[in-house]
């Protein structure tokens, strides 16, 4: 079911055929980003908590109104960053703002990691990023061409056999409290894996 916020009410728009228990609440399609206040978002989150096991709010880049709205009703945060100096610096600032808003349960996702560049010394490792930001790691997503392909095809990557798909699934499991080992990102896809993927399409 797709939900949309109209004034202070929620209305059903359409249903996701593949995931019957997934409900989506899209952001307002308006140029006025102040149309919804943090107080309204907190009220909405509190109401939804009575009906759903998990409520995930996707936060836009930056620290403006969209960020304030997203964290207003949050009790924990997943900070996603790439292993680049500028991105890690931005993530550090975000973590500081989360702490200032009394959101102390934060975890880190390192996105688009390339193990070959890490080995060459041209990219920070996930351990480097964790040391700098000082929060616990919950996921590492490799820089995987399957992400681009799935996005262009409009298909979910979670549950697929590729490394990125496995990484997404493992993050979900860790969020739910499972103890899941981290993937070996040095593994390269072999001929038979590629052949198997072709026949699955």
Segments predicted by a language model, with ranges:
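P-loop NTP-binding site
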Residues: 136, 166, 170-201
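Conserved catalytic-core segment of NTP-binding enzymes
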Residues: 43, 47-50, 54, 59-149
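Short, conserved glycine- and acidic-residue-centered signature motifs
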Residues: 37, 41, 87, 164
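Short, basic/glycine-rich phosphate-binding loops at helix/coil junctions
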Residues: 20-29
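Single conserved hydrophobic/aromatic residue that forms the stacking wall/gate
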Residues: 1-7, 11-12
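Generic secondary-structure signature for well-ordered alpha-helical cores
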Residues: 10, 54, 134, 143, ...
């Amino acid at each position: 079911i797709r939900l949309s916020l109209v004034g202070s009410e929620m209305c059903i728009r359409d249903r996701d055929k593949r995931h019957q228990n997934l409900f989506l609440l899209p952001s307002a399609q308006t140029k006025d980003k102040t149309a919804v206040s943090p107080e309204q978002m907190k009220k909405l989150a509190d109401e939804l908590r009575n009906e759903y096991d998990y409520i995930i709010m996707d936060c836009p880049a930056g620290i403006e109104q969209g960020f304030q709205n997203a964290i207003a009703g949050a009790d924990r945060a997943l900070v996603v960053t790439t292993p680049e100096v500028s991105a890690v610096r931005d993530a550090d600032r975000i973590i500081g703002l989360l702490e200032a808003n009394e959101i102390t349960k934060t975890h880190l996702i390192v996105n688009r990691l390339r193990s070959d560049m890490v080995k060459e010394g041209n990219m920070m490792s996930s351990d480097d990023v964790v040391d700098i930001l000082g929060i616990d790691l919950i996921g590492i997503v490799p820089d995987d061409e399957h992400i681009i392909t799935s996005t262009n095809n409009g298909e979910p990557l979670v549950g697929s056999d590729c490394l990125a798909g496995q990484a997404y699934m493992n993050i979900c499991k860790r969020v739910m409290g499972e103890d899941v080992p981290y993937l070996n990102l040095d593994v390269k896809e072999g001929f038979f894996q590629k052949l198997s993927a072709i026949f699955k399409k």
